[in-house]
Amino acid sequence: MIPDEIPYKAVVNIENIVATVTLDQTLDLYAMERSVPNVEYDPDQFPGLIFRLESPKITSLIFKSGKMVVTGAKSTDELIKAVKRIIKTLKKYGMQLTGKPKIQIQNIVASANLHVIVNLDKAAFLLENNMYEPEQFPGLIYRMDEPRVVLLIFSSGKMVITGAKREDEVHKAVKKIFDKLVELDCVKPVEEEELEF
């Protein structure tokens, strides 16, 4: 099959961004619990304070070391806005925060649909750095070197991408695996009757 016959129609969605935020100061979590509304802090159960935003639905775990783990953002912009909102809220309720927070993305989880049928048996045989045991798990696990991500690829053409540090890495990985699967003749177009509605 000529690669041009299968158009690239991938739809990619960022599902979750996990980031660490460094505040470069120690924090009094007991004072935060007493003054900031809608936070949870039970050091006997978990050493961090849990701060939830409703919209966007983002959770931050705040530790006395001044480190935060922020999860739930669907874009880098949403992540930055959420961190600013958390800092603003803490300051509003009397927390003395100095310096600028340093945000570092640790992991981006995304989903994608290539809108093709993937022959996983053939892909498992021809692709390097993969694991495919259909008796254990229906997806092929593919470790890509550049960008450094892990893709869970299903025969339906749907996939999960983990390990990216930037949103553009997700899009690059999806396009790269699509091109590779086409090159190896491991995909076929979805027939009209196979389309989901």
UniProtKB/Swiss-Prot annotation:
<keyword id="KW-0804">Transcription</keyword>
<dbReference type="GO" id="GO:0003700">
    <property type="term" value="F:DNA-binding transcription factor activity"/>
</dbReference>
<keyword id="KW-0805">Transcription regulation</keyword>
<dbReference type="GO" id="GO:0006352">
    <property type="term" value="P:DNA-templated transcription initiation"/>
</dbReference>
<dbReference type="InterPro" id="IPR000814">
    <property type="entry name" value="TBP"/>
</dbReference>
<dbReference type="InterPro" id="IPR030491">
    <property type="entry name" value="TBP_CS"/>
</dbReference>
<dbReference type="Pfam" id="PF00352">
    <property type="entry name" value="TBP"/>
</dbReference>
<feature type="repeat" description="2">
    <location>
        <begin position="105"/>
        <end position="181"/>
    </location>
</feature>
<feature type="repeat" description="1">
    <location>
        <begin position="14"/>
        <end position="90"/>
    </location>
</feature>
<dbReference type="GO" id="GO:0003677">
    <property type="term" value="F:DNA binding"/>
</dbReference>
<comment type="similarity">
    <text>Belongs to the TBP family.</text>
</comment>
<protein>
    <recommendedName>
        <fullName>TATA-box-binding protein</fullName>
    </recommendedName>
</protein>
<dbReference type="InterPro" id="IPR012295">
    <property type="entry name" value="TBP_dom_sf"/>
</dbReference>
<keyword id="KW-0677">Repeat</keyword>
<comment type="function">
    <text>General factor that plays a role in the activation of archaeal genes transcribed by RNA polymerase. Binds specifically to the TATA box promoter element which lies close to the position of transcription initiation.</text>
</comment>
<keyword id="KW-0238">DNA-binding</keyword>
<dbReference type="InterPro" id="IPR033711">
    <property type="entry name" value="TBP_archaea"/>
</dbReference>
